Structure formats: structure tokens, C-alpha cells
Design a protein with these regions (language model features):
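Short amphipathic alpha-helical segments
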Residues: 8-9, 34-35, 73, 92-96, ...
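A structured beta-alpha segment of the ubiquitous adenosine-cofactor-binding alpha/beta core
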Residues: 48-54, 59-82
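Beta-loop-alpha module in the N-terminal Rossmann-like domain of NAD(P)-dependent dehydrogenases
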Residues: 1-2, 63-71, 85-92, 96
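Conserved small-residue-rich beta-alpha loop and adjacent elements
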Residues: 1-45, 101
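Glycine- and other small-residue-rich loops at beta-strand/loop junctions that grip anionic moieties
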Residues: 25, 61-62, 70, 82-83, ...
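Generic hydrophobic/aromatic pocket-lining and core-packing "Φ" positions
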Residues: 11-12, 69, 90, 126
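ALDH superfamily catalytic-core signature
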Residues: 42-43, 80, 88-169
């Protein structure tokens, strides 16, 4: 998953609402979180210097494994948990947060599909399919994984998509 994007979307919403953010990144991508935290901290220092408005405590990063995530999920002071991961992880988080009447926002393992109907512009559909499946080398949760194609255009679309993928370098 692209760790900065999901954090940035959710953090921006929290800050607009006047809430602070605790980011517990995947233990596989801690440097991304630390770099973002550094940049955000510098922006806060400049904002404070220009306005006098205090910004401390708006963002914290916790580095650790599953135990750190579980502690955040269990803590009633954490009003909302936003988690990205597998469906089994999401089910566990949802149950634990619900047990304390908290809220959660879950982005779980997707299986994204594209539907191609007979009325589709096949050139445009081909470009969309190739970009959706290969645009980020498959390294995002929104990567196209399945095609649902009307049988009347299946052969023509397969030929176009195969040719397009053959052009990738």
C-alpha cells in the first residue's frame, strides 16, 4: 500500500476537525512515517513562529509491531482507529473497537474489478485496464485484479489488452 497517502488523507481530516493524530505505521515502512513526521514538525514550527498558535501534540508516531497496534485499538482515549490491512485484521480491529464503543475506518484487502460492457470504447477500456493493473506495478490496494467482460466483446478486448501489455517496458 502507499503508506503516506492513506495517512495524509486521514490526518488532514482529523486536523481540520481539531483532533490530533497518532500514526503507527507498518513495521515494514517506519522510515516513511518518520520522514513525514519530521516534515510536519517543521511546518508546525514555522506556523507557530508566524502566528504564535501552539501546534504541539498534533501528530505523534509510534514505531512498533502488533503489540503497539493492539494497545492503540484497546485504548478508550483513541476515539477513532483507521487501519489498513487484511480482512482478518480488519475483523479483529472492528470487534475490539466496537467492544469499547469506539469508531473505526478500515481499508482492507480489496479485489478490485472492472466491468466492460458491449457499449464501451475498447481503446479507452484497454488504456484504463493497463493503467489500473500496471500503473504502479501492482503496488497499491486499488490495483485492478479482475475483469468482468461481456462475452460478445471478450475476444476483441483480450487481444487489445494482450497487445498493450506486450508494449510495456
Amino acid at each position: 500500500n502507499f503508506p503516506v497517502a492513506v495517512w495524509a488523507w486521514n490526518a488532514a481530516l482529523a486536523w481540520v476537525c481539531g483532533d490530533s493524530v497518532i500514526w503507527k505505521p507498518s513495521e515494514k515502512t517506519p522510515l516513511t512515517a518518520l520522514a513525514c513526521h519530521h516534515v510536519f514538525g517543521e511546518a508546525c514550527r514555522r506556523f507557530h513562529a508566524q502566528t504564535g498558535i501552539e501546534t504541539s501534540g498534533l501528530s505523534e508516531v509510534l514505531i512498533g509491531g502488533r503489540d503497539v497496534g493492539e494497545a492503540l485499538v484497546a485504548d478508550p482515549r483513541v476515539a477513532l482507529i483507521s487501519a489498513t490491512g487484511s480482512v482478518p485484521m480488519g475483523r479483529t480491529v472492528a470487534r475490539r473497537v466496537a467492544a469499547r464503543l469506539g469508531r473505526c475506518l478500515l481499508e482492507l484487502g480489496g479485489n478490485n474489478a472492472m466491468i466492460v460492457r458491449p457499449s464501451a470504447d475498447l481503446d479507452l477500456a484497454t488504456m484504463a485496464i493497463v493503467f489500473s493493473a500496471a500503473g504502479t506495478a501492482g503496488q497499491r490496494c486499488t490495483t485492478l485484479r479482475r475483469l468482468i467482460v461481456d462475452p460478445s466483446i471478450k475476444d476483441a478486448l483480450i487481444e487489445r489488452v494482450a497487445h498493450a501489455f506486450g508494449q510495456l517496458t
